[in-house]
């Protein structure tokens, strides 16, 4: 992550010049300038590599009114400024002896010259700045899960999984090991540090873990990860999806998100004298996330389908609690081999989220707990799924919203998470999600037809 933009008054920064040199060295002939809209969809404009210097010194202009959640047509001129630290060569070639590169961009208003308040990457930058004002650096490590499905004869996605494997299975049950290997090769060529990959619990479900990094670089990596997984799966005639629950009555896909704060180079979450090896800072950070969890859910689990995953019985968290060992809790404190690895794991985000907005919401919520010195409730070490309502009330355990509408209601009542998003993103996000939930409510599903059409 760079401190400053590469855009200068006619000259190139050293980092931008290094990218120009690498473009020439690696025979890159096209560049994809990438950014993300409010809903988390990656957008891009392609330019010839010969225009790279101009992109760095002048930016690339585009019509922001055509991007969901950006601006109205009468204020539509926007400018992309590439971040040179994000340059990577894409792991596929359209022809021999040439390559395409990728740069992630920040979005600016042309009228004011200021960062665009609706740019999700800018939203996360503001959250990081808030942490830095308190003396903290934020590290994040996500675990995005995905499904691989067969394509039909027309190349369209089906819900037929490409294998019948289960958790940690090997071939022949796991038929996607070669696909995962190719994905890993592609990711590594783009600078990812891969820790492990494996078949997940559900048929056709997979996970590839990459190491933690600062929050902005990690959000960039999530956006890149999803694009690379889809592209390489397609080369194997498979469709990769990060939809949280594509098949009913089996485990859905989550994106467990590990977070830690560092201060002066030391892990601020570690306290070796504590029963759980957690500092007061860590406990207050956990308390902040628990306090704002209903509102965060709207951002971290942003689709109607997300709430088909967030039900008891399929290893997805539903109850607002934390534990040092229990995976039925919303937040878990994983075992750490070293003090530097101390962290907390938020288990409720899913991979359909906009990573920039989800990380920003989690950071703001946690820091709110730290600033207020919130007390963390006692950990719950029992299986919360087995609690009845009376026992949950005894423990003071509340539940996450049961649907997208309830989550958006919670977001509209939570000033901290609204502040995390900023006025523009909050307004446009709520507008989009209200519309999505309304569309869902008026639709008639196949389940309803199967259940009622011949009964009544």
Swiss-Prot record:
Q: Which reaction does it catalyse?
A: L-glutamate + NH4(+) + ATP = L-glutamine + ADP + phosphate + H(+)
Where L-glutamate binds, per the record, is at: 251-252, 309, 315, 327, 347
| PROSITE patterns given in the database record | GLNA_1, GLNA_ATP, GS_BETA_GRASP, GS_CATALYTIC
| Cytoplasm found in the keyword field | yes
Among the GO molecular function terms of this UniProt record, one is: ATP binding
Keyword annotations of the record: ATP-binding, Cytoplasm, Ligase, Magnesium, Metal-binding, Nucleotide-binding, Phosphoprotein
A Pfam entry, by short name: Gln-synt_N
**Which ranges carry the GS beta-grasp domain?**
26-113
Q: Which family does it belong to?
A: Belongs to the glutamine synthetase family.
Q: What is this protein called?
A: Glutamine synthetase
**Which organism encodes this protein?**
Haloferax volcanii (strain ATCC 29605 / DSM 3757 / JCM 8879 / NBRC 14742 / NCIMB 2012 / VKM B-1768 / DS2) (Halobacterium volcanii)
């Amino acid at each position: 992550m760079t401190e400053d933009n590469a855009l200068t008054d006619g000259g190139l920064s050293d980092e931008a010049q290094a990218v120009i040199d690498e473009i020439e060295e690696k025979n890159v002939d096209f560049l994809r300038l990438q950014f993300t809209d409010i809903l988390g969809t990656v957008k891009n404009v392609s330019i010839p590599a010969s225009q790279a210097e101009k992109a760095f010194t002048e930016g690339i202009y585009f019509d922001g009114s055509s991007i969901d959640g950006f601006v109205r047509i009468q204020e539509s001129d926007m400018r992309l400024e590439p971040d040179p630290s994000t340059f990577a060569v894409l792991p596929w070639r359209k022809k021999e002896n040439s390559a395409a590169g990728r740069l992630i961009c920040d979005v600016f208003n042309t009228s004011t010259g200021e960062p665009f308040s609706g740019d999700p990457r800018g939203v996360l930058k503001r959250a990081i700045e808030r942490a830095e004002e308190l003396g903290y650096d934020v590290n994040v490590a996500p675990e995005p899960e995905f499904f691989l499905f067969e394509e039909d004869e027309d190349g369209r996605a089906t819900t037929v999984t490409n294998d019948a494997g289960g958790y940690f299975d090997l071939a022949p049950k796991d038929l996607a090991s070669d696909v995962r290997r190719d994905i890993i090769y592609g990711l590594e060529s783009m600078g990812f540090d891969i820790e492990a990959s494996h078949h997940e619990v559900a048929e056709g479900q997979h996970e590839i873990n990459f190491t933690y990094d600062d929050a902005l670089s990690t959000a960039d990596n999530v956006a890149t990860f999803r694009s690379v997984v889809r592209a390489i799966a397609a080369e194997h005639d498979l469709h990769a999806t990060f939809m949280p629950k594509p098949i009913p009555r089996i485990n859905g896909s989550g994106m467990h998100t590990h977070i830690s704060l560092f201060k002066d180079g030391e892990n601020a979450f570690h306290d070796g004298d504590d029963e759980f090896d957690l500092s007061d800072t860590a406990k207050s950070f956990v308390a902040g996330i628990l306090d704002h969890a209903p509102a965060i859910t709207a951002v971290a689990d942003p689709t109607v389908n997300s709430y088909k995953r967030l039900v008891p019985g399929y290893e997805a968290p539903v109850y607002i609690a934390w534990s040092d060992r229990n995976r039925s809790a919303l937040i878990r404190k994983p075992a750490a081999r070293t003090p530097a690895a101390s962290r907390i794991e938020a288990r409720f985000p899913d991979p359909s989220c906009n990573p920039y907005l989800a990380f920003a919401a989690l950071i703001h919520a946690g820091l709110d707990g730290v600033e207020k010195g919130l007390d963390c409730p006692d950990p719950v070490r029992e299986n919360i799924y087995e609690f009845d309502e009376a026992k949950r009330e005894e423990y003071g355990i509340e539940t996450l919203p049961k649907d997208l509408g309830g989550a958006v209601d919670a977001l509209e009542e939570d000033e901290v998470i609204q502040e995390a998003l900023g006025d523009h993103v909050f307004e446009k996000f709520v507008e989009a999600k209200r519309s999505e939930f309304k569309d869902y409510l008026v639709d008639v599903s196949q389940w309803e037809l199967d259940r009622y059409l011949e009964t009544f």
